[in-house]
């Protein structure tokens, strides 16, 4: 038996740790470089659809995810301050039966902790925290990695491959692959957690709620094991205002919308703004260096698929890096398998944002379509998304 291949990964986020686990299961040695002092994740809620859940289950995380997540029975859609839902989309057991895994919501930090705990159980995964910088030298299959560790020492290695899972502001993409800087989308996500009792009588907390308005939209869902409800409010903001976002609350006037006014009043701890940027680049790899997740294809969250695409990426790339004759061959095959799908998800996400924010009279047509599709119409429309098998794709 030869020496196992070594793969270096930049970033101990959801993309990086999922890939580390997937590679470790194939027997590869994995080193994860993380600039933070611990595995940490910004944000609050996270939606895990069936296409991502199947990957996590395959990595042995079924129990950990089930323990910390919640499965909504459906999605209540409230356009323009309606008292009752225009439509309730079916989720729950129906979606699990159709796609082979449930649709769940959970706190991002809980998923990251589950991934980190699983990674710690593998002797062939090393996670190096507080890495201040790294340098790559690449020519063909020859690759040298130098990582500056917190004690001032430099870790030097010649791995089989280097994967940038270093997020929307990826150094791997911009410094080593000639990729673009992330582009501001014009949208900001404002996140908050509130106590469930503050929304009593306002929303059905057995379901997710989607509030639509021409100036914003809001997604609300419970995180029961944290005794909290996740609020994600999306507004359009001018780029010149971004530096002062954290000094103010979102500028939303509820008007006659009693429900919205109550939700806004329930936020005691304040809102945390998150500027939404996107990445579109055809350059996912060069030689033995490649990208996954937001580093390659950050997208608007309006189909709730950013994390899911990162998780899919890991499932597809791992077997390719394990079996391909060269890292370049693995990355090339990975791009061929993933780029078209990811582009489609990016386009659907952007389109959803426009649909959510439609003003009168276009909102009338939107509402008519939502009503006519019925509670299960979204299944057929999204079969291609939720029914995808990333594990099988990586074997092709």
Task: Explain the meaning of each model-derived region.
Residues 8-25, 29-36, 163-164, 220, ...:
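Conserved mid-domain beta->alpha element of the FAD-binding
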Residues 39-40, 171-172, 298-300:
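Catalytic P-loop NTPase motifs of RecA-like helicase/translocase cores
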Residues 2-7, 24, 49-195, 238-247, ...:
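Conserved N-terminal helical subregion
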Residues 188-222:
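Flavin-dependent oxidoreductases
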Residues 1-5, 67, 83, 261, ...:
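C-terminal helical "tail/cap" subdomain of flavin- and related membrane-associated enzymes
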Residues 137-138, 222-224:
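Short, low-complexity Ser/Thr-rich regulatory SLiMs
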Residues 202, 214-216, 224-226, 233-303, ...:
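FAD/FMN-dependent oxidoreductases across multiple families
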């Amino acid at each position: 038996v030869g020496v196992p291949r070594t793969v270096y990964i930049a970033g101990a986020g959801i993309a990086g740790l999922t890939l580390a686990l997937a590679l470790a299961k194939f027997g590869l040695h994995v080193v994860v470089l993380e600039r933070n002092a611990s595995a940490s994740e910004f944000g609050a809620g996270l939606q895990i659809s069936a296409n991502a859940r199947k990957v996590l289950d395959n990595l042995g995380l079924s129990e950990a995810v089930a323990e910390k997540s919640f499965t909504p029975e459906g999605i209540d859609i409230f356009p323009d301050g309606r008292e009752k839902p225009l439509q309730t989309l079916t989720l729950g057991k129906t979606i699990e039966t159709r796609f082979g895994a449930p649709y769940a919501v959970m706190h991002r930090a809980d998923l990251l902790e589950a991934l980190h705990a699983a990674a710690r159980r593998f002797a062939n995964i090393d996670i190096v925290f507080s890495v201040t910088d790294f340098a790559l030298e690449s020519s063909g299959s020859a690759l040298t990695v130098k990582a500056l560790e917190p004690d001032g020492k430099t870790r030097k290695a010649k791995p089989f491959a280097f994967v940038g899972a270093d997020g929307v502001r990826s150094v791997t993409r911009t410094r080593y692959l000639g990729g673009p800087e992330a582009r501001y989308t014009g949208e900001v996500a404002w996140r908050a957690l509130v106590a469930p009792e503050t929304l009593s009588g306002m929303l059905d907390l057995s379901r997710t709620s989607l509030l639509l308005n021409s100036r914003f939209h809001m997604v609300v869902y419970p995180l029961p094991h944290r005794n909290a409800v996740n609020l994600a409010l999306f507004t359009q903001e001018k780029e010149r205002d971004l530096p002062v976002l954290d000094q103010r609350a979102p500028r939303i006037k509820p008007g006659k919308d009693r429900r919205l006014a109550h939700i806004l009043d329930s936020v005691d701890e304040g809102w945390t703004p998150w500027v939404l940027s996107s990445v579109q680049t055809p350059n996912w790899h060069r030689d033995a260096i490649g990208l996954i997740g937001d580093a390659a294809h950050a997208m608007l969250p309006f189909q709730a698929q950013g994390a899911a695409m990162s998780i899919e990426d890991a499932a597809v790339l791992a077997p390719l890096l394990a079996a391909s004759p060269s890292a370049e061959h693995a990355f090339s095959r990975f791009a061929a398998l993933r780029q078209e799908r990811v582009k489609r998800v990016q386009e659907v996400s952007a389109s959803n944002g426009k649909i959510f924010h439609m003003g009168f009279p276009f909102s009338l047509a939107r509402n008519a379509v939502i009503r006519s599709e019925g509670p299960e119409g979204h299944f057929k429309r999204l079969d291609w998304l939720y029914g995808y098998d990333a594990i099988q794709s990586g074997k092709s």
